Amino acid sequence: MRFLFLACVAGGFATGVASKPVCKTPEPDWRQDVTPADVTRLHEVRESFVKALAQARAGDHGKDVAREGLLLDPDAAIDGAALPVGDYHCRTIKLGSQSVSGPSFVSYPALDCRVTANGKVSRFVRVNGLQRPTGTLYPASVRQQVFLGTLVLSDETRALNYGRDTDRNMIGAVERIGPRRWRMVLPYPRFDSTLDVIDLVPAN
């Protein structure tokens, strides 16, 4: 804080004109909060997407994949990734499997999610369900937000802090895929699937 103050003062006198210094608050950066393991997971998001689709098709779910259209197209992202504040219908699809005998395609009914403002970042919460991703949405690019969060289970009432439990840590890419449609892509989750995709549609 002291360094920041001095930098602002120096900036104010750099031109020789007495003026009120203007200090900019640093932009939030997910890289400052993420674990090394999750950096790797995010870098492999496309790899996990392609692998999960191949597993689903090999498991005789080609028609299920095709039916989802842009939602399960790895290259469907368009500009405008930032999720607006509000309530959403959110439907999870689990693609691929971490075990030989596990299902390679599971589509769950839509549940309720909410996005709220929290300074220069946003807060994402799944309101109901047995597995509830909860965490922070960071700006990354015009085509991506980064989600860092944890998985809240069953009747738990509070989320663990990100980074406390590697089995609960979650990282994902939020992308817009239509005029009023987004998705959250979660590569290599700790349980069950190779990739989770959450379909996000505004509730109103």
Which residue stretches match the model-derived regions?
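Cleavable N-terminal signal peptides
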Residues: 6-7, 17
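Mid-length scaffold segments of soluble, non-membrane domains
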Residues: 80-145
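Short beta-strand segments that buttress and anchor functional surface loops
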Residues: 122-128, 148-150, 184-189
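An anionic, turn-rich surface loop/hairpin at beta-sheet edges
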Residues: 98-111, 147-173
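Amphipathic/hydrophobic helical signal segments and adjacent flexible N-terminal regions
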Residues: 18-83
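Edge beta-strand at a domain terminus
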Residues: 66-70, 162-204
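Positively charged n-region of N-terminal signal peptides that target proteins for export
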Residues: 1-4
